[in-house]
């Protein structure tokens, strides 16, 4: 393998690690923040702050002119990935346990593969086997976490998440097909500010802005919000969007399989939650499936 190819492979591995770990911790951060902030206010604040910082960085650098295609890409990412994808996640976090919510997001790789298949790109056999194994691991993990019958609000939240993953997969595919942004950081800021504006409107419709206790937020809440703005939003999103340009969208979407594993391990390590042998076996099956999806394309 040549040096440029080796460097590219290393960057891809690092980017995947950033996405896997960063987004795997988002559920925990949202869980704590929702104790003090309404859902759409939380989403709007997070992405207004992150988008504003990305825009400030862009304005401090030499600027290429905005292309017409930049607006189409920003609308696709801002609406489908941020407003819908993240908005549904934050909203559902009120009604669903963190682990189950992360499990529902594992439908994203399934939608991505189905979309690629419908558009004429049949996945390799090992990728399909990996999807089956990873899906089985998630079902096993979910069966280990199920309790009493879900309420109507929980069913609605779960259905909303599944619909959001379908729209996320469509948005990721659209971004991959469109020309790259003339400036990657400006493109990131445009997507975040568009998404934040829509989340703010959702909050207005939902009545969230009538309950805005930012002046009384605890120090812990501010730290969690800072974590979501800096390492997660300004660290994970650039890595994710770069990966969409470098590898198939269905491969990038494997983060959704790893998220429940990260959430489960965080609960075990930080919250002293029990990790049963069944849950551990489910995690190993999920990681095996993800490995097959990744290496099955080589």
Predicted regions, residues:
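Glycine-/small-residue-enriched transmembrane alpha-helix faces in small-molecule transporters
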Residues: 1-41, 149-177, 197-201
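Juxtamembrane helix-entry segments on the extracytoplasmic side of multipass membrane proteins
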Residues: 8-12, 36-40, 44, 66-72, ...
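Transmembrane alpha-helices of multi-pass small-molecule transport proteins
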Residues: 11, 34-84, 109-115, 133, ...
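Specific transmembrane alpha-helical segments of multi-pass solute transporters/efflux pumps
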Residues: 22, 26-27, 55-105, 140, ...
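Hydrophobic/aromatic residues within transmembrane alpha-helices
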Residues: 33, 42, 46, 92, ...
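Specific alpha-helical transmembrane segments that line the substrate/conduction pathway
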Residues: 41-52, 81, 89-122, 138, ...
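Helix-helix packing/entry segments at the starts of transmembrane helices
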Residues: 43-45, 86, 100-107, 174-197, ...
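Hydrophobic transmembrane alpha-helices of multi-pass small-molecule transport proteins
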Residues: 54, 107, 123-145, 199, ...
């Amino acid at each position: 393998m040549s040096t440029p190819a080796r460097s590219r492979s290393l960057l891809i591995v690092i980017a995947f690690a950033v996405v896997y770990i960063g987004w795997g911790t988002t559920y925990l951060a949202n869980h704590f923040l929702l104790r003090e902030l309404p859902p759409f206010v939380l989403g709007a604040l997070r992405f207004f702050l992150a988008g504003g910082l990305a825009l400030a960085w862009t304005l401090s650098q030499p600027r290429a002119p905005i292309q017409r295609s930049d607006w189409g890409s920003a609308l696709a990412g801002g609406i489908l990935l941020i407003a819908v994808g993240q908005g549904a996640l934050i909203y559902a976090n009120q009604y669903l346990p963190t682990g189950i919510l992360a499990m529902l997001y594992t439908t994203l790789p399934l939608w991505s593969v189905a979309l690629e298949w419908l558009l004429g790109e049949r996945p390799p056999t090992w990728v399909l086997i990996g999807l089956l194994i990873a899906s089985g691991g998630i079902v096993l993990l979910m069966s280990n976490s199920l309790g009493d019958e879900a309420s109507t609000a929980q069913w609605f939240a779960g259905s909303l998440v599944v619909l959001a993953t379908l729209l996320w997969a469509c948005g990721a595919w659209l971004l991959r097909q469109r020309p790259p942004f003339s400036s990657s950081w400006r493109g990131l800021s445009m997507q975040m500010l568009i998404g934040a504006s829509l989340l703010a409107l959702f909050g207005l419709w939902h009545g969230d802005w009538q309950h805005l206790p930012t002046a009384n937020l605890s120090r812990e809440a501010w730290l969690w919000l800072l974590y979501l703005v800096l390492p997660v939003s300004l660290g994970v999103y650039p890595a994710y969007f770069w990966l969409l340009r470098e590898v198939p969208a269905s491969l990038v979407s494997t983060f959704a399989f790893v998220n429940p594993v990260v959430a489960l391990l965080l609960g075990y390590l930080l919250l002293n939650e029990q990790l049963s042998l069944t849950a551990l076996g489910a995690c190993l099956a999920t990681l095996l499936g993800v490995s097959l999806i990744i290496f099955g394309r080589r």
